[in-house]
C-alpha cells in the first residue's frame, strides 16, 4: 500500500490501508465467485504513540516524532490482540506506567481506525462483512 501524503506515521498508515485494500480486493473476489468465502478472521490496524514534552501523544506528526522522548508503533487486530509493539526510548529510559498508558491510548486509536475501516467497507459493499 503506497502512502500518497503523510506528515508522519507512514508505516502505520500503510498497515491500516493495506488491510483495507486487501479486504476490499478479497470481497470483490468473493462477489465474482473466485473465492467461496472471505478468508479473513479479523481486521488489522496500526498507530503511532509516544511521549512528547512529557505528554502522551497519539498519531504523532512528523514534528512530534522528531522530538519525541518515547516513540512507539503498535499493530493490533480488531479484537485487540497485538501483532507488533515496537518502542524506543529516544533519550532516557521510561517507566512501565508510561508503556501501559501508551498501549491503552494505542488501543483506543486503533479502535477508531477500525471503525473507519469498517465504515468504508460497509459503504463500498452494502451488507458487507463488517467483522473482519
Feature locations, PLM:
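Polyanion-binding surfaces on beta-sheet-dominated domains and ring/shell assemblies
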Residues: 1-132
Amino acid at each position: 500500500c503506497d502512502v500518497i501524503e503523510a506528515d508522519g506515521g507512514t508505516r502505520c498508515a500503510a498497515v491500516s490501508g493495506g488491510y483495507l485494500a486487501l479486504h476490499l480486493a478479497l470481497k470483490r473476489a468473493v462477489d465474482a465467485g473466485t473465492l467461496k468465502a472471505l478468508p479473513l478472521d479479523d481486521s488489522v490496524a496500526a498507530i503511532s504513540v509516544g511521549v512528547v514534552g512529557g505528554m502522551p501523544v497519539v498519531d504523532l506528526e512528523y514534528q512530534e516524532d522528531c522530538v519525541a522522548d518515547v516513540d512507539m508503533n503498535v499493530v493490533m487486530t480488531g479484537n485487540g490482540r497485538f501483532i507488533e509493539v515496537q518502542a524506543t526510548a529516544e533519550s532516557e529510559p521510561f517507566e512501565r506506567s508510561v508503556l501501559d498508558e501508551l498501549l491503552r491510548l494505542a488501543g483506543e486509536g486503533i479502535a477508531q481506525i477500525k471503525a473507519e475501516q469498517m465504515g468504508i467497507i460497509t459503504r463500498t459493499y452494502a451488507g458487507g462483512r463488517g467483522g473482519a
